[in-house]
Amino acid sequence: MEWPNPVTLATANLAIIDTSVYIDNLRSRRFEKELLGLQFIVRCSAVVLAELSGGARSREMSRFVDTMAKNLRIIAPNEREWVESGKIVARLVAAKGYDIHKAREIHFDVLIALTARRMGAYLITCDASDFIAIRDLVGFNLICW
């Protein structure tokens, strides 16, 4: 796990937690210690909320999503980020040969990354390969667990 140094934290103390971290933690409590020890102010991506809501298969998961929506500041991609995200997905498809299903899946990740970049926030994920591919095209702060 790669943590930013304290000087960086003083200037960029916001974080967006990716869907993959929430899902892994809900299933196995894998990141419980890391989440409780975060030295960031967490902002919730509207895209992450949508992914979690769409995948909620239990009452516990639905309650978790509702609690997040009530208690965290929600941030959403703006119009420019939506337009830019399509261009980035097209570049990823051309470079990596993604099929239509992978292109749709990674489109959400691109939107999350662009929102994090605009805010100067760290994006925390356990889906390293996709976000590293995105970061190769778009600079943003990334922490992979």
Language model: regions and residue ranges:
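Alpha-helix capping/helix-boundary segments
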Residues: 21-22, 48, 81, 112, ...
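A general structural signal for well-ordered alpha-helical segments in protein cores
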Residues: 49, 62, 82-89, 109
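Acidic catalytic patch
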Residues: 73-101
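Acidic, PIN/NYN-like endoribonuclease modules and their adjacent C-terminal/linker elements
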Residues: 1-10, 113, 117-145
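Short, hinge-like loop/turn segments at secondary-structure boundaries
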Residues: 59-63, 92-93, 140-144
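Short, well-structured N-terminal submotif of metal-dependent ribonuclease cores
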Residues: 1-48, 53-67, 72
